[in-house]
């Protein structure tokens, strides 16, 4: 338990940011999982839509400071590569 008021505030701010980051990362993982399921079903149009949603979610995570831009670029590249492999 912090004794100094500023330290107590930092604990609270950290807790709030952690919750926010966890929520954003969880939503990101869900969108990526939905894209992977669409790939397994070999539905080309659905997979394209899910890929667009996944890339949008990744970009939003970068904007909010949850992911580093290079990490996001790597994730987008891998997802796009998997989509292109399916479509030929």
From Swiss-Prot:
> Does this entry carry the keyword RNA-binding?
yes
Q: Region Disordered: which residues?
A: 69-88
Please note every region of biased composition (Basic residues).
71-88
- Example of a GO cellular component annotation carried by this entry: small ribosomal subunit
Does this UniProt record's set of keywords contain rRNA-binding? yes
Which purpose does this protein serve, as stated in its record? Answer: Binds directly to 16S ribosomal RNA.
Family, per entry: Belongs to the bacterial ribosomal protein bS20 family.
Record-given protein name: Small ribosomal subunit protein bS20
Record lineage: Bacteria, Bacillati, Bacillota, Clostridia, Eubacteriales
Identify the gene encoding this protein.
rpsT
């Amino acid at each position: 338990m912090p004794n100094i008021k500023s330290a107590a505030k930092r604990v609270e701010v950290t807790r709030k940011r952690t919750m926010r980051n966890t929520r954003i990362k969880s939503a990101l993982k869900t969108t990526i999982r939905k894209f992977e399921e669409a790939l397994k079903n070999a539905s080309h149009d659905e997979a394209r839509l899910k890929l667009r949603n996944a890339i949008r979610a990744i970009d939003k995570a970068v904007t909010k400071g949850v992911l580093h831009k290079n990490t996001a670029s790597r994730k987008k590249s891998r997802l796009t590569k998997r989509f292109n492999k399916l479509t030929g």
